[in-house]
Structure formats: structure tokens, C-alpha cells
């Protein structure tokens, strides 16, 4: 039938995928995969062509609920979800509520709506898979953050997994600095008692360039979650690295620009006041609001880099050809963290993300 990948991977199908991810409390990694898939499909600017940070947050906060009681934030596993009908139940309920575009083409040559009609999935069972009308959580599972620590609006929080610390949707904490994940793991092993209530752990130099390769940090987040539960404290974590879908807690990833290229996260110092404000969808370092302090710290960082052959000494070791290629060519997480020579993002046969008449709306909300 001469169906090509670009017939299937379109602006509308990518938007559908993001909405499904929100509705199941999915991994923060969706905001790495989606921009890179969009680029491979010909869209050069994810924010302009597919979905802006502002629209993403509006949908997550006001339109799309979480409709599964699933680990790591809930009770049930993917096996349980599959036993209740799986993803087709979720997609049908989202589509019936007005949240998904059913006109997108699928690999069966049917539209999404035609495919769901043929499969005729059951209604949500109400225990494992909830409905949009009576959701598990009222708001979507993900939130993108801006602010002076994330001017690219790349930072992402898995809101569905937050267990505490957001009184009135605001976290106010003290920065605890760790240059590299191993430094944090060593501290958690040897002296975990140093962490106090409302600490904000900063793990940096783990981004696409700094890692290099943006390594996953499930080990760190799992240990911090255990620490918090055992000591009845709130400890948050922020990093220019990334997390597994299994992470829970107040953890913020993909902060960019990353530390290895001199992003604001590199300029945070021990004890700085860090505010996460979900009313504004921002993460800010209060001392860096002072332009003189920002300039002084940036000059100090640059001096360190200049005295180390152009690379900060805290970056990870690029000891293979692939890792060295990543160090020299990786772009920011907000663009998918892929490798592009000269960090000039390559898009083959670019196309425009023309808007359709479909607008996601929840018929159960006014």
C-alpha cells in the first residue's frame, strides 16, 4: 500500500503518544525520545512543530489525568494492566474522552479509530485501569520546567511519582552539590546521615556531553527514595542526567543547558536556595538571580575549563570512540540528546508541523 514511516510518524501521532505517556504516568524519557523521533521524521523544531512546553504543561495540569494505578507510583504492574485489556483500553478511553486524534494512520493501514473499533477493547475495570471520567489522579504525570536553572525548558519532573515536599506546589530546599553520580553514591554508602530534610541534591556533569551519553540514574533515585522513607524526610534531586521509568520521588532530570557546557546548573554552590515552583513551572537558584553573582561564578567556571584544555575536570571519562564522539557532538536533551557533527542538528527532508483541526479536550471537564 506504499505506506512509509513518515505517513505514520506525524505531528498528530507524536502528540498522541505524548498524551498517552502523560495518562499512564510514563517515564520522563518520553521527552528525550519524542524530540528525536520527530527530528528523524522531518520536524526541525519540536517546540514549534509538535508541542511547546507551555502546551505540554497546560495539558498535563488541566486536561489529561493519570488513569492507571501502576508502579512505581501505584500498586499494579504492566502484567496486571495487560490482563485488563492493556494499552487498547487506555487508548479507547482517552479517544472517547476527546484526548486523542483518531484520524492518525497506523501500521495496519487503518486509522487509530478504525483499529480500536476493530479490536473492540473492554471498558476500564476501575481498579487497575481507571477512566478519564473517574481517574486515578486528576492531573497528568509529567511537567516541564523553565526558570533560571532551565532556560531551555528542558527540565522534566515525573509528577505522578512525587511522594511529598510540594506544599502549595512549591519545594524550597538547600543545594547539596555532587559532581558526578558516583560521588553521590559514595556518600549514600558511607555517610547517608548527612542528608537532611529539604535538601536538594544536585548531580551534574552527567548530561549528553558531560556523562558522556546521559547515563541513567535509577540507582541514585532508588537509594534516595529508601533514605526518605526510612528517615521520614523529604530529599529532592536535580540533574542534567536522566532517570529510569522506575524512579519515584521529587526528582528532576534533563536540566539544560548541562553543566559540561557551562549551563546554570554548573554555577550552583553548596547551600544555595533552590525553589521548585509548579505554580509557575519553574526551577530557580535564588543566588543566581543576582547578575553579579552569576557573572562571577560563570567566570570562575570558565577559568577552570580554560586551565584544563577546554574541558571541565568533573566530566565523565570518554574512553571509547563512541563516547568521545558523543562528547564532541551531543546536543541538548531538549533536542533529543542525539549526536550531530558540530552540534548542528541535521534534519533530512524537513517538513512543517502543520496543525490539524483536532484539539485535545476532556469532555468531562468544563
Question: Residue spans of the language-model regions?
Answer:
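Catalytic or ion-coupling anion/metal-binding cores of large enzyme and transporter domains
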Residues: 1-234, 238-258, 263-366
Amino acid at each position: 500500500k506504499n505506506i512509509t514511516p513518515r505517513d505514520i510518524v506525524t505531528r498528530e501521532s507524536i502528540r498522541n503518544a505524548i498524551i498517552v505517556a502523560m495518562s499512564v504516568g510514563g517515564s520522563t524519557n518520553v521527552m528525550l525520545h519524542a524530540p528525536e523521533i520527530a527530528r528523524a521524521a522531518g520536524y526541525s523544531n519540536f517546540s514549534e512543530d509538535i508541542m511547546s512546553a507551555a502546551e505540554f504543561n497546560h495539558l498535563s495540569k488541566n486536561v489529561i489525568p493519570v488513569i492507571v494505578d501502576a508502579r512505581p507510583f501505584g500498586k499494579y504492574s504492566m502484567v496486571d494492566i495487560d490482563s485488563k485489556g492493556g494499552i487498547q483500553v487506555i487508548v479507547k478511553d482517552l479517544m472517547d474522552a476527546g484526548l486523542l486524534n483518531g484520524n492518525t494512520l497506523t501500521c495496519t493501514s487503518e486509522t487509530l479509530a478504525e483499529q480500536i473499533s476493530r479490536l473492540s477493547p473492554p471498558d476500564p475495570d476501575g481498579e487497575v485501569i481507571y477512566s478519564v471520567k473517574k481517574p486515578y489522579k486528576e492531573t497528568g504525570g509529567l511537567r516541564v520546567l523553565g526558570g533560571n536553572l532551565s532556560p531551555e525548558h528542558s527540565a522534566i519532573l515525573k509528577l505522578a511519582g512525587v511522594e511529598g515536599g510540594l506544599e502549595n506546589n512549591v519545594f524550597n530546599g538547600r543545594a547539596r552539590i555532587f559532581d558526578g553520580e558516583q560521588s553521590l553514591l559514595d556518600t549514600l554508602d558511607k555517610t547517608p546521615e548527612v542528608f537532611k530534610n529539604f535538601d536538594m541534591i544536585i548531580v551534574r556533569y552527567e548530561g549528553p556531553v558531560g556523562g558522556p551519553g546521559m547515563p541513567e540514574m535509577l540507582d541514585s533515585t532508588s537509594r534516595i527514595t529508601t533514605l526518605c522513607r526510612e528517615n521520614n524526610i523529604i530529599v529532592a534531586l536535580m540533574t542534567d542526567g536522566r532517570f529510569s521509568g522506575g524512579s519515584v520521588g521529587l526528582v528532576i532530570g534533563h536540566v539544560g543547558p548541562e553543566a559540561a557546557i557551562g549551563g546554570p546548573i554548573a554555577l550552583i554552590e553548596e547551600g544555595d536556595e533552590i525553589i521548585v515552583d509548579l505554580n509557575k513551572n519553574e526551577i530557580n537558584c535564588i543566588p543566581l538571580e543576582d547578575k553579579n553573582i552569576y557573572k562571577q561564578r560563570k567566570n570562575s567556571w570558565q577559568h577552570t575549563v580554560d586551565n584544563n584544555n577546554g574541558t571541565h575536570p568533573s566530566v565523565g571519562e570518554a574512553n571509547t570512540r563512541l563516547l568521545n564522539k558523543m562528547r564532541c557532538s551531543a546536543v541538548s536533551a531538549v533536542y533529543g540528546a542525539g549526536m550531530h557533527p558540530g552540534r548542528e542538528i541535521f534534519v533530512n527532508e524537513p517538513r512543517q508541523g502543520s496543525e490539524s483541526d483536532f484539539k485535545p479536550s476532556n469532555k468531562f471537564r468544563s
